[in-house]
Amino acid sequence: MAKQHEHVISIEGLVNRFGPQTVHDGLNLQVRRDEILGIVGGSGTGKSVLLRSILGLHDPNEGRIEVLGKTIRYLEPGPHKQWGVLFQGGALLSGLTVQENVELPIALHSDLPVETRRELAVLKLFMVGLDLTAASKYPNELSGGMNKRASLARALALEPKVLFLDEPTSGLDPISATEFDQLISYLRANLDLTIVMITHDVDSLFGVCDRVAVLVNKGIIVDTPDK
């Protein structure tokens, strides 16, 4: 009997239009538990629109999206504490130290005492390979690779079940990009994460992704990287 996959994200009949332009027309996609799914596509195929739709930050014209069994609706409360997001630019707050950035979602979504929040923030930073020296710095004092890692630590702050990565290796040199890919694989294996990654990095697709979803002809085709 074929193995049954549990889907943590399910998209059915997604339609996104912008004026006369249709970006997605009846798009269907299922993301399996514990997999790393890479999403690729040319300019204008709607990679960012798809991600924003899943996160409830864009209101599709039609379709149904479920994440962790919950229907996602535009700007409505959802299972947000169960997912983490690494935005393309990192989106760290420039006026806070790295540790304070990581601590912020913990402070907003828990009643933990300050000292415990700080300890958890440092733990997340250690998890992504950053030490106490980096923790005390501000985002503009970090290298590009360290900034990505700090942003990833913040995305992991609430111990999510699903992690969304938007161009995680963009702007990194080849060595740093490879190290970041290795970190993603390590975190998936040790934290039981399901990861959805938008990327144009071919090495990432072949190095870490279990399946690749290609946006084409207003829809999507999913297969293993070697196909």
Annotate each predicted stretch with a short phrase.
Residues Y138-L142, M146:
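Conserved ABC ATPase signature
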Residues L55:
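Helix-to-loop junction immediately C-terminal to a conserved catalytic motif
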Residues L163-D166:
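Catalytic Walker B motif of ABC-type/P-loop ATPase nucleotide-binding domains
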Residues E159:
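Conserved catalytic motifs of ABC-family nucleotide-binding domains
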Residues E115-T133:
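Conserved ABC ATPase "signature" region
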Residues T71-G84, E115:
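ABC ATPase NBD coupling module
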